[in-house]
Amino acid sequence: GCFALVPLEEAAAPLVKLIRSFRPHVLTTYDENGGYPHPDHIKCHEISMFAFEAAADPDQFPELGEPWQVQKVYYHHGWSYERIVAIDAAMTRHGLESPYKERLANWQVDPAHDQRVTTRVPCSEFFEVRDQALLAHATQIDPDGFWFAVPREVQAEAWPTEDYELVKSMVQTSVPEDDLFAGRR
């Protein structure tokens, strides 16, 4: 089968159950374009947004546990033009070949999209853990690919954050933020 073709309610039910049992305060997902137009990532976005609403609604999926209201939803924005330019420049400064030259030459700059980021979470000390998690998806991630061609210390110098867009909040907060739990702490 194809994940992108699974009916929405069927695909969302396991996430509704997980939200109700785990009871998270924050949910992160892809934006409406899936980070880039990838059908499975777009489906992940649709499922996440549906499950966010359904998990809080006692009339939806009552067999999946007590309702739970996630308090904040963020879209992850990992591929901004600004970020890639900064990493490319850092590679050049370090005398390294940037894997992004061709991508940048063909990039369709969309300033409105890059301006959507509301939250930059400093997390460079966890880049190794992030990379190990990515590499665990052996069929999806090329360990010799462009992302892993950039040394972690260069990434940490050029762009030490993961970037998000706050799209739903049930708690008082103000942007910009540097913590996904702002308003909760």
Language-model features and meaning:
Residues 1-2:
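A charged helix-plus-loop insertion that forms the helical arch/lid used to bind
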Residues 5-185:
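Metal-dependent de-N-acetylase/amidase catalytic core
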